[in-house]
Design a protein with these regions (language model features):
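Beta-strand C-termini and the immediately following turn/loop, strongest in propeller blades
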Residues: 26-28, 34-41, 51, 77-94, ...
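A short loop-to-beta-strand structural motif that recurs across blades of beta-propeller domains
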Residues: 46-48, 98-100, 149-151
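Short catalytic/ligand-binding loop motif for oxyanion handling, primarily in non-cytosolic enzymes
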Residues: 16-17, 42-44, 98
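Low-complexity, flexible helical/coil segments
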Residues: 71, 97-98, 137, 148-149
Length: 153
């Protein structure tokens, strides 16, 4: 994706209500900043990582969709796991919103984390040591698909 002053984040906002930057994630040592940029029509989402010392930006992953890229319903559901050289990506590529694990170096899919006729609403917490993800989802349980439940995988 070439530089373009009209590019936006996937949320259309640069900062949240509390002033925090959206669609960004710092490494623990603040040496790297992961961020998502999007085309204005939101048909393209692009994960990139900037080196905070040099300013160099590495292209990590790009998803193109026919309609509108959505990174989650209540939050941006992507994470870079700098310690394990992986990243979690949210996609509706199977017509449902699910999360996928990719290798950060090779950019190859390692694992489909969630599947089924339901959707992940929000990644709540990732325990890197136990390799567990806590997330909310809708439509997984019988009954009202709008009821949201907390899960661990």
């Amino acid at each position: 994706m070439k530089n373009d002053f009209q590019r936006s984040t996937t949320t259309d906002h640069i900062a949240g209500r509390g002033g925090e930057f959206l669609d960004t994630q710092w490494s623990k040592d603040s040496s790297k900043l992961a961020f998502i940029s999007s085309s204005r029509d939101h048909k393209e989402a692009h994960l990139q990582i900037a080196d905070s010392k040099t300013g160099n930006v590495q292209s990590v992953f790009k998803e193109n969709v026919d309609t509108y890229y959505e990174s989650g319903l209540r939050a941006e559901n992507w994470r870079v796991l700098f310690d394990s050289d992986e990243f979690i990506w949210y996609s509706e590529k199977d017509d449902w919103g699910h999360i996928y694990l990719y290798d950060l170096s090779t950019k190859k899919l390692k694992n489909t984390i969630t599947t089924g006729n339901w959707l992940v609403r929000e990644i709540m917490h990732i325990d890197n040591d136990k390799r567990e993800i806590f997330f909310t989802a809708g439509g997984k349980e019988k009954g009202n698909p709008y009821h949201v439940y907390l899960y661990k995988i």
